[in-house]
Structure formats: C-alpha cells, structure tokens
C-alpha cells in the first residue's frame, strides 16, 4: 500500500506540459514568460513561408525571443512525422507545435500563409499576414 501511495504522490507532483511540439517534447507557458513569441503559421507549398525560414532561424537565437511554427495543414491533421520531415527538408531550427494553437490562444484559422502572431505573456500583440524580412523581425523585437 505504501508503494502505491508514494507512486501516486510522484505522479501527481509531475508537471504536465500545457502544449506539445512535433518532436514529442512538451512545454508550459511559464517557460516563455517575458519572451516574445513569434508563432509562425507556414506551409511547404507557400514560397514566401520557405523564404522566411532562415530569418526566423536567425531571430530565434536572440535572447528573450522564441519562434514556434505550426504547419497550416496541421489544422487538417497533418501527421507530426511529416511536419518533422518537412522541417528537416527546409532546415528549420525552431520548434513546431503539435497542439492546435487555437486551443492555446484566442486565434482564428488564418486566411492566408504566412501568418505570424506576436505573443508575449499569453497576449497576442500583433498579427502579421505578409512575409517578414530580417529588418522587420528586428524592428518587431525592438518594439516589443
């Protein structure tokens, strides 16, 4: 009985992730407190999305900045394995959500890609529906 009680206490004390990435790892919102999150909705059939990848890879290296992707076709249940394959194909260095972002933030399905949401402390600060340049990304980081 004592073993079961200890096991139960251990299981209840383990922190569960609030969302998952396509690599199987999880995270909590607290992990990104005071960081600027660029949530980039992309697709492999979108040339401007592919052009943005190196820019997002670069800005993701900045302190207090996190880039998180979500493939547009995941709204229709594109498997994580396929998303990971595409991310490798395009040399994407940032993480990609497995959890539908509409369940994490008050987002609507974007009308177009690329769409990038700028989020800080759970609040959506801006929605950008055009391709971003390195200069614009740096400007957005500086202003947020």
Q: For each of these PLM feature ranges, what is it?
A:
Residues 1-7:
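Sec-dependent signal peptide recognition
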Residues 12-13:
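C-terminal motif of bacterial Sec signal peptides marking the signal peptidase cleavage site
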Residues 18-37:
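A short beta-strand-turn-helix
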Residues 35-37, 41-45, 112:
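Short pre-active-site segment immediately N-terminal to redox-active cysteine/selenocysteine motifs
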Residues 41-58:
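Conserved redox-active cysteine motifs that mediate thiol-disulfide chemistry
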Residues 65-80, 92-101:
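Thiol-based oxidoreductase modules, predominantly thioredoxin-like and allied folds used
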Residues 84-119:
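Short, internal strand/loop/helix patches
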Residues 118-144:
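Thiol-/selenol-based redox modules, centered on thioredoxin-like
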């Amino acid at each position: 009985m004592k073993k079961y009680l200890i096991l139960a206490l251990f299981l209840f004390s383990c922190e569960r992730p609030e969302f998952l990435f396509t690599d199987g790892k999880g995270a909590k919102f607290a992990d990104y407190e005071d960081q600027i999150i660029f949530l980039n909705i992309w697709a492999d059939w979108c040339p401007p999305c592919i052009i943005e990848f190196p820019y997002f890879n670069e800005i993701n290296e900045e302190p207090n900045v996190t880039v998180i992707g979500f493939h547009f076709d995941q709204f229709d249940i594109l498997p994580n394995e396929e998303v990971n394959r595409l991310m490798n194909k395009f040399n994407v260095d940032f993480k990609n959500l497995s959890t539908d972002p509409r369940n994490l933030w008050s987002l609507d399905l974007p009308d177009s890609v690329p769409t990038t949401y700028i989020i800080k402390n759970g609040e959506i600060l801006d929605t950008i529906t055009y391709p971003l340049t390195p200069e614009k990304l740096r400007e957005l980081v500086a202003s947020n």
